[in-house]
């Protein structure tokens, strides 16, 4: 199973309106709070749909933003990146540092994602999860509804 699912109504956390959500990757589940100051939940879903469509089409990767703020006024964006390898999909949590991404726009988020690596510069293993392509396709199709 794979997906990012909203839970209930938006709430205020530390003075910011957020959408309680969770990401599910097979047996793993992590709570998320999607900020709603720049994007609403529809914007997130449209971005995921576009990014997944691109990644599935070119069989490389898709970046699913889970903390979108106005790019000119923020330093980084949290994402979950899906790397497609045949029937397997590897999922890593990723931060896009906007100062390193000249010309960043949310519409082209996949262009600012590097190829999958399994170890960082210090040789430490990068945390990642995996799921199957059909689970990602199910999530992709659910975004159209």
UniProtKB/Swiss-Prot annotation:
Gene3D superfamilies: 3.30.2450.20
Induction cue: Not expressed under laboratory conditions.
InterPro entries in UniProt: CDI_immunity_sf (IPR053755), CdiI_C (IPR040509)
CDD domains with a match to the protein in the record: CdiI_ECL-like (cd20699)
Source domain of life: Bacteria
Protein purpose: Immunity protein component of a toxin-immunity protein module, which functions as a cellular contact-dependent growth inhibition (CDI) system. CDI modules allow bacteria to communicate with and inhibit the growth of closely related neighboring bacteria in a contact-dependent fashion. Protects cells against the 16S rRNase activity of CdiA-CT, its cognate toxin protein, but not against the toxic effects of a similar rRNase, non-cognate CdiA-CT from E.chrysanthemi strain EC16.
Subunit structure: Interacts with cognate toxin fragment CdiA-CT.
Protein name as it appears in the record: Immunity protein CdiI
